[in-house]
Every structure is written in C-alpha cells, then in structure tokens.
C-alpha cells in the first residue's frame, strides 16, 4: 500500500478529492447493490415469510452497523491528522490502538445482539409469524459484527492514508462471494433465512481478512504488527471521543426514523408500499454523498496535521460543493426518471404513483442535507464530535419526532410528513455551520 498512499496536503483539492472519492462512491454503491441482491434473492427463492423476517431486522441491523461505521470515523480522523503531521510514532500508536478498540466494539455488539435481539424485535412489534425467522437471522448475522468492525477499521486507515481503491476491490470480491453463497445456500441447500445470514458473515470475514492482510503487508513503519499491539489510553480516549458520538448519532437516527415510519403506516397499504420502494433512493444518494464526508475527514485531517490552515478550510468547502452537487443532480434525476426507478421494485401503477409523491419532495431536498453533514464531518475532522452530535440529535432527531406529532398530526398528508426532512436539515445545518466556524476560528492550526 506504500505506493497507494497520497499526500493530501499539496496539489489541487478539487482534482484530488474527486479521484479520492470516486472509489468511495463505488464502494458505497456496491454495498447498496449487494444488499438489494440479498433481499431480491430471498424474496425470489425463499418466499414472502422469509423475506418479511429478514426485512423486519433492517432497523436493528442498520442501528448497529451505523454504530460501528461511526466508530471507524474516529480512526480515520486521527490517523489522517498524525500522518499529515509526519508524526510516525503517534500514527503507529493510533493504528494499533484503533485495532484493539475496533475488536472490542465488534465483540460488544456481538454479545449484545445475541442476548437482546429477540427482546428488541418484540419491542419493534415484529409480527409473530416472522419473529422466529428474524431472531435466527439476526443471531447468525451478528456473528459477523467483529469482522465488520475490523473491516471498518481497515477502511478508515486506508482512507486516512489516501488509499480508497483497496477497500473497493475487497468489498467487490466479498460482495460477489456473498451473492454466490446466497444462491447456493438458499437454492441448493434450502437453508432459507439461515443461508442468507451465513453468506453475509462469510463475506464479512473475507473482506476483513483481505483488508487486514493489506495492512500487514504495507511497506515501511506503518505495517500492522502483533509486536506493536499496545493499548494506548490517550489514543483510545481520542478515538472514543470522536468515534463514539458519531456511532451513537447513527443509532439515534434509526429511532427517529421509527416515528416517521409510524406516520407512513397511518396510510393505506399502497402508500406504505410506495414509500418502501421510493426509500431505496435514499441509500443510493446518501451513500454517494457520504463518500465526500469521508474525504472531508481525510483531507482536513492530513492538512490539520500539516498545519495548513487555508487547505483545512478549503477541504471543507470543496467537499460541501461536491456532496451538494451530487445530491441536487441525483435528486432531480430521480424526479425526472422516478417512474422508471420505481418500476425496478414494483409493477403496480398505484404503488408507483404513491412512490412518486415521496420522490418528488425528497428529490428536491437531498442536496440540502449536504450543508448539515459536511459541517458535522468538518467539525469532527478538527477533533470536535460531541457538540455536533448533540446538535444533530436535537435538530434532526427530536425535531422530527415533534414534527410527526404536531405538523403531521394536524395536516395528516404525505407532503406534511416528507417536508420534515428539508426543514430539519435546514435548521440543523445553520447551527452546525455556525459551530464549525467557531471551532475553525478557535483551533490552532500550524
């Protein structure tokens, strides 16, 4: 990986960030496609009950995977900062401490899932006929959480070094294995829900193995070495200070989304189905935009470490421009070609019409989320994670719950529900940007 490391402290930010982010966009896009393939496979070959069982675990799975991804963000920020500062000792300490922290986080999530998944699924009102299959799926799936934590660790380190290609290659290989094993376990072995979960964890351990192998083989002083595995309390504190709030934020968003889903569920089955189909656009656009938030952390981290104040600011502005552009252009494209997009998930014209109500509002809203998320990423890149998390919890989570129980409860229309997104993004963005400007002005850089 030595030849793949990039110095993000020199050259054109526009060009470097674009080429840095393209593999990240493709990585996130592949992940969405593989998840869709999982759902399609079990729906086609295992029946509606199995599909419902797997689908009923989505919120729980997203909550914990989001937590692990957020924890990886702390690794990305710190490694990039020390690497940019040419501080080898701190970089090495951070990498090896982050590996131990990631392993611990993965094991904690695994144990929690095995012990409490059934109770949580019951609290989420999982239908009785789906509960046994859902519990079986989630308990097998959670066996892969340590691997997911390790892959996110490796991905964060690679991104901090400016290498976004290897994670793409490894995820692509693991995703193909996942699809093949899915079909084999479900069609040939008749393993149903257990087969889908088993395929997922095998592919997760494969991707973790590949990325850890790359870090072991890296040239120079930054290679992973068992002899260097030490738990540095100071570095662990920094990692948790940045990563834990981000992980908790991802989880709390899922709680807020439950209130939104409850609002959708007050409409008829056609509208619920249309919402589900249209919601597939969220992952495509959010994950594409998220690539530039990761880039923001890596670019700002390296330049922060290098003491280049102006490039720190410009890295934030460029990532904001790119993410806003993708969200806006992609959203408008979904409005124009929305019926064709929804046709990938349903042949029912009524469901397509219902889905277009969501897509039309969301299509013109996606881009505005960039102002909120870019500011959050920028604050975390400067080591400030707690306050941005508190702001987003109040502005985008609690605000949404209040909106559902006031504005939506009064009007009881689909537009009055979906408009909460752009209003919550706008309000939160204003506060997040003000906070970032304050942090930037008061942070000693260089």
Annotate the PLM regions.
Residues 22, 38, 75, 116-117, ...:
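Hydrophobic/aromatic residues in alpha-helical transmembrane segments
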Residues 63-66, 178-182, 208-212, 284-287, ...:
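Hydrophobic transmembrane alpha-helices of multi-pass small-molecule transporters
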């Amino acid at each position: 990986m030595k030849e793949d490391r990039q110095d993000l402290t020199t050259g054109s930010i526009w060009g470097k960030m674009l080429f840095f982010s393209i593999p990240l966009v493709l990585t996130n896009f592949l992940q969405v496609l593989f998840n869709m393939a999982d759902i399609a496979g079990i729906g086609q070959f295992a029946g509606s009950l199995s599909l419902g069982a797997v689908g009923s675990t989505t919120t729980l799975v997203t909550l914990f995977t989001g937590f692990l991804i957020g924890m990886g963000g702390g690794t990305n920020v710190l490694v990039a900062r020390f690497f940019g500062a040419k501080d080898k000792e701190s970089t090495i300490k951070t990498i090896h401490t982050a590996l131990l922290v990631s392993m611990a986080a993965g094991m904690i999530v695994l144990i929690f899932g095995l012990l409490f998944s059934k109770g949580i699924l019951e609290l989420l009102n999982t239908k009785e006929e789906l509960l046994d299959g859902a519990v079986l799926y989630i308990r097998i799936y959670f066996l892969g959480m340590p691997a997911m934590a390790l892959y996110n660790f490796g991905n964060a380190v690679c991104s901090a070094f400016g290498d976004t290609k290897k994670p793409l290659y490894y995820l692509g290989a693991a995703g193909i294995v996942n699809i093949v094993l899915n079909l084999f376990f479900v069609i040939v072995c008749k393993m149903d829900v257990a087969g889908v979960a088993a395929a997922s964890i095998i592919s997760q351990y494969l991707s973790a193995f590949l990325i850890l192998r790359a870090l072991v083989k890296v040239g120079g002083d930054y290679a992973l070495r068992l002899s260097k595995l030490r738990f540095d309390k100071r570095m662990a504190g920094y990692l948790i200070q940045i990563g834990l709030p981000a992980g908790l934020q991802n989880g709390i968003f899922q709680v807020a989304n439950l209130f939104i889903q409850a609002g959708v569920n007050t409409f008829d089955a056609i509208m619920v189905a249309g919402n589900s189909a249209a919601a597939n656009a969220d992952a495509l656009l959010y994950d594409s935009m998220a690539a530039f938030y990761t880039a923001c952390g890596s670019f700002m981290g390296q330049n922060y470490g290098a003491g280049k104040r102006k490039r720190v600011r410009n890295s934030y502005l460029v990532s904001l421009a790119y993410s806003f552009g993708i969200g806006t252009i992609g959203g408008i494209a979904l409005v124009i070609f929305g019926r064709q997009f929804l046709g990938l998930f349903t042949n029912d014209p009524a469901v397509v019409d219902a889905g277009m109500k969501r897509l039309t509002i969301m299509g013109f809203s996606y881009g505005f989320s960039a102002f909120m998320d870019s500011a959050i990423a920028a604050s975390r890149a400067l080591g400030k994670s707690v306050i941005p998390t508190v702001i987003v919890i109040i502005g985008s989570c609690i605000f949404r719950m209040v909106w559902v129980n006031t504005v939506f409860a009064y009007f009881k229309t689909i537009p009055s529900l979906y408009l909460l997104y752009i209003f919550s993004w706008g309000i939160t963005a204003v506060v997040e940007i003000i906070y970032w400007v304050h942090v930037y002005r008061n942070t000693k850089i260089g």
